[in-house]
Amino acid sequence: MSWDQVWIDVNLATMDPSVSAPYGAITNAAIAVKDGKIAWLGPRSELPAFDVLSIPVYRGKGGWITPGLIDAHTHLIFAGNRANEFELRLQGASYEDIARAGGGIISTVKACREADEAELFELGRQRLNALAKEGVTTVEIKSGYGLDTETELKILRVARELGKHHHVDVKTTFLGAHAIPPEYKDNSDSYVDLIINKMLPAVIAENLADAVDVFCENIAFNLEQTERVLSAAKAAGLEIKLHAEQLTNMGGSALAARLGAKSVDHIEYLDEAGVKALSESGTCAVLLPGAFYFLRETQKPPIDLLRQYGVPMVLASDFNPGSSPICSTLLMLNMGCTLFRLTPEEALTGLTLNAAKALGIEDTVGSLVVGKQADFCLWDIATPAQLAYSYGVNPCKDVVKNGKLVHQ
């Protein structure tokens, strides 16, 4: 056989639903790569003969290979920090209190409007490096810290540039409807007009976004405004997603499901009717335990109902300066289990196959299947559950991206 590389002495957590074992596991396995794709995988005993003198062979020393991790919800590009708000919350102020007083997202908006692209790029590069060291091979990055046309475009341009200069694939999301900017505080409908009539066409003209998101909440955009933005995005051929049911149940998830959204994110206050709507539309539920933890929330997402209705559950970092300043997907695995009572297998599925579904890329990444992109990680672990069980020492030993060894 003619391959570009072969990995032996490994166990595979394929996350392939067609493999009946937990995690889609194949033990005592091998995996071969050709032209950036998975060319063969299976038990080592069935590995076809190949020229060991001309093909690089990597020995995994009994470790586990998983698909590359996918962080499907981040706000990774921003300037400044909000440590002062952290102190205020510890003194009793709520997320809503801070937002209504002009803090929260708006304070980061000010910093991003003042920062240039070079500064934002370097900050984003450092954060993307941190995720990459934990085995992330694909990341979603949202805008939303500009809230004017110029700065929203600036953030999205930086995200696109990061994707061009980093081995991690970057999917971009336009989140102009993240908050009401101060200049539109008393006229939010006019800001929605600006998003639809000026921002969105400019984003599309430069091909800066793969999807459009809205923060549907009582401190942000109401249902009617949310539908206007998402409908305009859908009409323009972009994928849609939604921040919903984080602080209250406004029915945003049902709206998103009706419009065919790829995902609904946060969903702490999602009810059974909303879960049923997600199930019927095939919309993913993105769980963000970092924000739940950092905001010291008590209302948990309806995990049992999501299981009952078969809604794909995704885990993501929600990395951002205000509600989840936690740049770690491995910690999300642990939090998903300890805070939301996911099983370790559900948690890992949420950072691989289901995360790919939330981004609409499950045909190319998210599981180890012949023909899919060769994005995978070798972990120094005895069992896949160990990724969620223990945190603090990074067990990621090697990362292969598009068939190339990028971290060793």
Curated annotation (Swiss-Prot):
Origin species: Shewanella putrefaciens (strain CN-32 / ATCC BAA-453)
Protein name stated in the entry: Imidazolonepropionase
GO CC list: cytoplasm
Family: Belongs to the metallo-dependent hydrolases superfamily. HutI family.
Keyword Zinc applies: yes
Residues engaged in binding N-formimidoyl-L-glutamate: 145, 320, 322
Cofactor(s), by name: Zn(2+); Fe(3+)
Matching SUPFAM superfamilies: Composite domain of metallo-dependent hydrolases, Metallo-dependent hydrolases
Cofactor comment text: Binds 1 zinc or iron ion per subunit.
Pfam family, one: Amidohydro_1
Chain residues that bind Fe(3+): 73, 75, 243, 318
Enzyme Commission numbers on file: 3.5.2.7
Role played: Catalyzes the hydrolytic cleavage of the carbon-nitrogen bond in imidazolone-5-propanoate to yield N-formimidoyl-L-glutamate. It is the third step in the universal histidine degradation pathway.
Residues holding 4-imidazolone-5-propanoate: 82, 145, 178, 246, 323
Molecular functions (GO terms): imidazolonepropionase activity; iron ion binding; zinc ion binding
Upper lineage: Bacteria, Pseudomonadati, Pseudomonadota, Gammaproteobacteria, Alteromonadales
Major localization class: cytoplasm
One GO-annotated biological process of the protein: L-histidine catabolic process to glutamate and formamide
Name of the encoding gene: hutI
Record-listed Zn(2+) binding positions: 73, 75, 243, 318
Catalyzed reactions: 4-imidazolone-5-propanoate + H2O = N-formimidoyl-L-glutamate
The entry's keywords: Cytoplasm, Histidine metabolism, Hydrolase, Iron, Metal-binding, Zinc
Superkingdom, natural source: Bacteria
NCBIfam families named among the record's database cross-references: hutI (TIGR01224)
Keyword Acyltransferase: no
Pathway: Amino-acid degradation; L-histidine degradation into L-glutamate; N-formimidoyl-L-glutamate from L-histidine: step 3/3
Compartments where located: Cytoplasm
InterPro entries on file: Amidohydro-rel, HutI, Metal-dep_hydrolase_composite, Metal_Hydrolase
